[in-house]
A protein has these predicted regions:
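Short Gly/Pro-enriched turn/cap motifs at secondary-structure boundaries
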Residues: 98, 113-116, 140-143, 162-163, ...
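Internal helix-loop-helix
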Residues: 31, 35-102, 142-149
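Structural signature of FAD isoalloxazine-binding scaffolds in flavoprotein oxidoreductases
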Residues: 52-64, 117-121, 201, 207
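C-terminal helix-coil-helix/basic helical segment that borders enzyme active sites and/or dimer interfaces
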Residues: 13-21, 250-251
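Glycine-rich beta->alpha junctions and the first turn(s) of the following alpha-helix
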Residues: 182-252
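A structural signal for short hydrophobic beta-strand segments in well-ordered beta-sheet cores
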Residues: 123-126
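A short, Trp-centered hydrophobic/proline-enriched beta-strand micro-motif
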Residues: 101-109, 153
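A short core secondary-structure module
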Residues: 135-183
Length: 252
């Protein structure tokens, strides 16, 4: 991983930092080299084409990734493990293409006015026969490039609990290009130059029952599995950043 970073990533840092963009051809080059090196989808199970590395191993890799621009290392590719909840045709339509790099996904949770506070979420989906009708918006949804689909979290009802009503959150697989689904690039990142954010809006988007990821109402549980480990990887990235800047300071 260190050799890959020094050869394929570090040489492009100055350009990305000054220009604020990662040209698509450069991103695809990094993606291709990552696949050849066996780094792409290293976090996913071997039986579906991933690297099958342990969480500890991935954390060590993330520490190395943290030594460079997020905009560059995100092209190496680490599909969200939430997609492991795919079943039936979802596996061939979403999971496997993400593992091979044919498709890219977005994790769409944060909203205007609510941020990542899921209990403040306003995006909602109501039943219409066997289908769902999705409405709402998401922002600050990040990724290296325009995605092929988004994993969208929306309120699908209320559950009575001992602490009072609790929003029932469900995850949906929503393809870019679906009628009523609009996506555009959002605000530029100050510290993550070249890393894209997207704004998503949903206006009466009709989704079939096969576009529910996992079970209706278990969106929070799905999100928690990924976010919990993701926080560890963020910490590993931060350690890598600190390690590199100390090294650069010593050299200077």
């Amino acid at each position: 991983v260190k050799a890959f970073m020094e050869k394929e990533i570090f040489p492009h840092e100055d350009f990305v930092d000054k220009s604020g963009v990662v040209p698509d051809d450069l991103g695809r080059q990094i993606e291709k080299k990552a696949k050849e090196a066996g780094l792409y989808s290293a976090n996913m199970p071997e039986n579906i084409g991933g690297g099958g590395l342990s969480k500890k191993a991935i954390s060590l890799i993330e520490r190395e990734y943290g030594k460079t621009s997020h905009a560059l290392h995100s092209w190496i590719g680490r599909p969200t493990e939430i997609l492991l909840a795919c079943v039936g045709d979802q596996i061939s339509n979403y999971l496997q293409p993400c593992v091979t790099g044919e498709k890219r996904e977005l994790f769409a949770l944060s909203e205007p006015g609510a941020g990542s506070d899921v209990m403040g979420m306003k995006s909602n989906a109501r039943r219409d026969g066997a289908d769902w009708i999705l409405n709402g918006s998401k922002h600050f949804i990040s990724g290296p490039c325009m995605p092929d689909f988004a994993i969208v979290f929306a309120v699908t009802g209320l559950d009575d609990t001992k602490r009072g009503p609790r929003k029932r959150i469900t995850a949906f697989l929503v393809d870019v290009g679906t009628r009523g689904f609009e996506i555009s690039e959002g605000n530029k990142s100050v510290s993550y130059r070249g890393y894209k954010t997207f704004q998503l809006s949903f206006n009466d988007v009709r989704l079939g029952p096969d576009q529910v990821l996992g079970e209706e109402g278990n969106g929070l549980e799905l999100a928690g599995k990924w976010l919990g480990m993701g926080r560890i990887w963020v910490g590993a990235c931060c350690c890598g950043k600190a390690e590199r800047i100390i090294g650069l300071a010593n050299e200077w």
